[in-house]
Every structure is written in C-alpha cells, then in structure tokens.
C-alpha cells in the first residue's frame, strides 16, 4: 500500500500546526524541510528534540529528510558541504527515516552542468562513503538546472555510482517546468523506474510560471503515474508538494485549504486507478 507524506511547510510555518494538520487529514508521514521557518539542517539539538516529540505525539513518521544537499555550485568548497551531508545522515538516524532527499549540483556561473559529469560523480561517491555504517540512503530528486535535470542524467548517476545507498525521487512536475516535457510517464518514467523508491506528487501546467496545479489538472500525468505505481503494487511514500500558491528554488506555499484539495484529488485519482493509498 502506498503511503501519503507531505512537505507540510507548504501548509503553515508553525511545525506544531504542520503535524496537527497532517494528523487531521490522516496523512501518516511528514517530510520535514522548514520547521518554524528554519531549515531542518539548521536546527539546534533542543529544536530537533522538540520537533521529534511533536511528530511522535501526533503519531506521524518521517518519509525522508527534506534536505537541500546538492543545491550548491560545483565551484564552491566541497568539504563544508560534505560535513553538512554528514549532519543530514545524523538527522535521518535521529528521525528514524531511511532516506535523505538531495540534489546533484549546479554548474559554475555561465557554464553547462552537463560538462561537469565527472565532478558530480566524485561528489556522489564521497557521500556514499559518508553513509557507511548508517541504514540510510540518498534519494536524488530530478530538478531544473542541476546535473539530474533529465531522466537520462538521473539514471546515469545511479548506474555510475552503482550503490543501493543512492536511489531516485521522481518528481513529474519538475520535468514539465524545467524540461518542457508533457509526457513524462512515457519518456522519463521508464528510464528512472529501476531506481525510483520515492515519489513527489506535484503537478504543473506547461508555461504556468511559479504556481502548480491541483494533482490531475496539469501536464504532469499524475493519474498515469499513479496507475504505474498501482501496477507495481507500490508500497513507498508519495510526498505531497503541490506549490498551489507559489513555488521556488528551496520550497513553496499552498495553504491548508488548497493542500486539502490536493490531498483529496490524489486519493480520488489513486482510487480510480486501483492504487491502495493510506
């Protein structure tokens, strides 16, 4: 049975209200990213303890750490960034989640990221080393302007690094917004499917700017993707990130009413295609 999760910072800035909201919507997982307006990577020990208690008190589990790892340019120093990744590993262990969401770097200013393949692979390999001994894996999200902007490049990362510690988070809307693809299930999904363990539910209309669509109403083929998951008897997490008020490089906003509408739409679409969804 597939499981719903959410970037609940799109609902409200208050973390207590985030977990209350998800519990009320009967969404059993959360993907923490911004907690009381602070990135999860920047929280103090006391703030982390408080967040963990709220999650536990409302009966939620963590689908992945919503980290911004990999959203830096390749000409920035790597060691401080690797240290941040090691902290993300500690956070995953602390929040008892198997995954860290991450990205595959931007090119130096004015350069083409596809020309930096070797450097990307070296950094990914270094992060695999940092995962040694932890029951945690990276899930790389396809996104515009990073090396993994295309399905082929995402698969290339997994094939080249060749480790079960590196898998993919599939975001259909990012192919619409960044690659101008409106048939991602036909042309992107088959390429990435062998490595996908995590799904982002976000829909988009081609040319819509920085505002997403209610799932099923854009060009992201959400219903078709859910049908693919149903055929696989998928039991992973589908993380809601609808961006129905605005979206940006490091997050977005939706608000409670629109978020509830998005959740209802996904549940309805899942039922239509026979995807068991909790």
Put a short name on every predicted segment.
Residues 1-8, 12-28, 52, 56-59, ...:
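Histidine-acidic metal/acid-base catalytic patches
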Residues 6-7, 39-40, 76-77, 115-116, ...:
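A generic structural signal for short
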Residues 22, 89-92, 131, 229:
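Hydrophobic pocket-lining residues that define ligand/cofactor binding sites across diverse proteins
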Residues 28, 32-125, 133, 137, ...:
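Structural motif corresponding to the early beta-alpha repeats
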Residues 123-129, 159-161:
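Histidine/acidic residue-rich metal-binding segments in metalloenzymes
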Residues 139-147, 170:
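Aromatic-lined carbohydrate-recognition surfaces of secreted/lumenal glycan-active proteins
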């Amino acid at each position: 049975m597939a499981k719903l999760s959410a970037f609940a910072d799109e609902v409200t800035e208050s973390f207590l209200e985030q977990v209350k909201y998800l519990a009320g919507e009967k969404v059993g997982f959360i993907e923490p990213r911004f907690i009381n307006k602070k990135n999860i990577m920047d929280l103090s020990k006391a703030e982390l303890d408080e967040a963990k208690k709220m999650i536990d008190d409302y009966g939620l589990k963590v689908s992945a750490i919503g980290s911004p790892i990999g959203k830096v340019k390749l000409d920035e120093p790597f060691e401080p960034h690797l240290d941040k990744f090691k902290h993300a590993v500690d956070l995953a262990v602390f929040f008892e989640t198997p995954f860290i969401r991450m990205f595959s770097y931007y090119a130096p200013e004015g350069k083409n990221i596809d020309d930096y393949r070797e450097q990307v692979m070296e950094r990914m390999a270094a992060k695999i080393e940092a995962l040694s001994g932890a029951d945690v894996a990276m899930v790389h999200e396809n996104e515009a302007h990073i090396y993994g902007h295309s399905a082929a490049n995402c698969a290339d990362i997994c094939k080249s690094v060749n480790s079960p510690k590196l898998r993919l988070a599939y975001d259909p809307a990012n192919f619409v917004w960044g690659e101008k693809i409106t048939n991602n299930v036909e042309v992107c999904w088959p390429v990435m499917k062998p490595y996908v363990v995590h799904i982002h539910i976000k829909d988009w209309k081609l040319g819509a700017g920085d505002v997403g669509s209610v799932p099923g109403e854009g060009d992201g083929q959400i219903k078709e993707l859910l049908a693919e998951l149903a055929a696989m008897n998928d039991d992973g997490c589908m993380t809601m990130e609808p961006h129905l008020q605005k979206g940006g490089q490091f997050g977005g906003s939706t608000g409670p009413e629109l978020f509830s509408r998005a959740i209802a739409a996904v549940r309805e679409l899942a039922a239509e295609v026979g995807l068991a969804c909790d």
